[in-house]
Amino acid sequence: MTLEEARKRVNELRDLIRYHNYRYYVLADPEISDAEYDRLLRELKELEERFPELKSPDSPTLQVGARPLEATFRPVRHPTRMYSLDNAFNLDELKAFEERIERALGRKGPFAYTVEHKVDGLSVNLYYEEGVLVYGATRGDGEVGEEVTQNLLTIPTIPRRLKGVPERLEVRGEVYMPIEAFLRLNEELEERGERIFKNPRNAAAGSLRQKDPRITAKRGLRATFYALGLGLEEVEREGVATQFALLHWLKEKGFPVEHGYARAVGAEGVEAVYQDWLKKRRALPFEADGVVVKLDELALWRELGYTARAPRFAIAYKFPAEEKETRLLDVVFQVGRTGRVTPVGILEPVFLEGSEVSRVTLHNESYIEELDIRIGDWVLVHKAGGVIPEVLRVLKERRTGEERPIRWPETCPECGHRLLKEGKVHRCPNPLCPAKRFEAIRHFASRKAMDIQGLGEKLIERLLEKGLVKDVADLYRLRKEDLVGLERMGEKSAQNLLRQIEESKKRGLERLLYALGLPGVGEVLARNLAARFGNMDRLLEASLEELLEVEEVGELTARAILETLKDPAFRDLVRRLKEAGVEMEAKEKGGEALKGLTFVITGELSRPREEVKALLRRLGAKVTDSVSRKTSYLVVGENPGSKLEKARALGVPTLTEEELYRLLEARTGKKAEELV
């Protein structure tokens, strides 16, 4: 390659990387995978090293990311710069990292390292003065980020006040979305026909950038912290001499710290930890795209310093990319228990993360339009959250012109009934649709619902084909003679299944509500409804206003639930379940001792805050996150926040934790220990 050819390619790569930085850091909507981005950056680095005259101070190899949009949130300049990390992709590159340290320090290793999971989320910086949180901000370009304080404070584990810390302190960490929360959020968005998130990192970034903190609060974000900016030297003078000790110091101060960190000696020791964690990667509750390797001794950090982009004492050792290219051969349409029609892509089979992948959900019309995906396209697939096969992007550069657009059916693929279109969602309105019946029974019997073990998909199909069941209530009318003689169903299997069905009657109201598939009702909302109303009879008579008082219920969900509760077919189903002996009382019964009262909690309590909130709701109270004139009481714990000042200004009564428990005892006749 000549110098001019290299110059042209370097300029192309810089423009391309800057564009993808903008998509990744600012819009939180990347167009390419991490592996593809790493390949571009590596190519640029190699060309700059091969042709030093092409190096430039504004090259993306010397920068962290893209500046945030000024119109979104207030720009904040970090007191000390937030650096990115250089990457290693194999043991040789890890050894090269250690060799660079040896040369810089003028002595041979091996050195001690702290190894941490590289949680795939959004980097944030918390700034404290005299132990009080002043603001929290995203990393942005490393020098200027966006203030997102109110949204960060919806994460309950982030401390607002600290004791025994430097006067000015920066604490760095990662905000992420647990895989379970990510899958649940996408399921809700898909059900509404809205745009889904491609991965947990995008979901975390999008949730943290919400203008309404109430939306952020419902997204289940978590945070983990691992570094200091300002204040590090003072903490060192207190005797914290290693990264391992610093993580322990952060935990002592009340910060959430990802527990799976380890010490290792030398590159070979790090490699052993890396390989062990790689095997266990999919057991983690969060996405991790590698490990972070840091020289353990903090004093050596100052000797080594930083490049323009990254520290010389740390490196990200990335897990191998788990993405595959394949072709979309066809699209079929499935009908769910609510009648929603979902497109499913049929792929040329590929082996991905230990299993063969031949089908992938295409979610809804919005998703297909956004991807501009067509039958015959080459696509890049991965497993979202390490679980569900998903299309990362369409490889449009490989199109031949023979690809075909995806056409939505006008009639139900299962029963032939004409489909209804609600926004971007297509539904079958036929109550007798066999696919809806199948999915309703399958969901009812699932582990998180009524947990009827042994009632698998094949058996449900046979029961429907033989006319033995038409809906979930019919399960409780099955007899041994109905089952014996079905394919692969002997007398013992029949007895076991009937025993499981009988045991499912005792699951309680919260599991039953989830099992019945009320619109918008997942596990959390089912628990909240059960705690608020206590039994099915009270819920059936609930008003719109009462439903709106339930935590997590918005107006659209409340109206949809109310419509279902008033539906004669639903009421008849409930009646038949009750006659069959299905219990319809909450396992944790609610009450009316605090009905009509609204509580807000501030500060640290002796019991976990969520436990106290659940207790108040169980007794009929409403618990909110902000103080208003409608607040009945503000419960004040240790180190209260600004809610106390607002309560005083509005004249809202306050209770200490002890006074709260005395109030509960007076209202219920029971001590707090008996109620919790």
Swiss-Prot record:
Q: Which cofactor does it need?
A: Mg(2+); Mn(2+)
What keywords is this UniProt entry annotated with? DNA damage, DNA repair, DNA replication, Ligase, Magnesium, Manganese, Metal-binding, NAD, Zinc
The GO molecular function terms of this record are: DNA binding; DNA ligase (NAD+) activity; metal ion binding
Q: Which InterPro entries match?
A: BRCT_dom, BRCT_dom_sf, DisA/LigA_HHH, DNA_ligase, DNA_ligase_AS, DNA_ligase_CS, DNAligase_adenylation, DNAligase_N
Pfam families membership:
BRCT, DNA_ligase_aden, DNA_ligase_OB, HHH_2, HHH_5, Nlig-Ia
Q: What is its EC number?
A: 6.5.1.2
Nucleotide-binding found in the keyword field: no
Q: Which GO terms describe its biological process?
A: DNA repair; DNA replication
> For this protein, what reaction is catalysed?
NAD(+) + (deoxyribonucleotide)n-3'-hydroxyl + 5'-phospho-(deoxyribonucleotide)m = (deoxyribonucleotide)n+m + AMP + beta-nicotinamide D-nucleotide
Main enzyme class: ligase
Annotated thermal dependence: Thermostable.
Chloroplast keyword on record: no
A cellular component annotation (GO) from this entry? cytosol
Q: Which residues form the BRCT domain?
A: 589-676
Q: Where does NAD(+) bind?
A: D34, A35, E36, Y37, D38, S84, L85, E116, R139, E174, K294, K318
Residue positions binding Zn(2+) = C412, C415, C428, C433
Q: Which domain of life is it from?
A: Bacteria
Q: Where is the active site?
A: K118 (n6-amp-lysine intermediate)
Provide the family line.
Belongs to the NAD-dependent DNA ligase family. LigA subfamily.
Function noted in UniProt = DNA ligase that catalyzes the formation of phosphodiester linkages between 5'-phosphoryl and 3'-hydroxyl groups in double-stranded DNA using NAD as a coenzyme and as the energy source for the reaction. It is essential for DNA replication and repair of damaged DNA.
Matching entries from NCBIfam families are given as: dnlj, PRK07956.1
Q: What is this protein called?
A: DNA ligase
Naturally occurring in which organism (per UniProt)? Thermus thermophilus (strain ATCC 27634 / DSM 579 / HB8)
Q: Which gene carries the instructions for this protein?
A: ligA
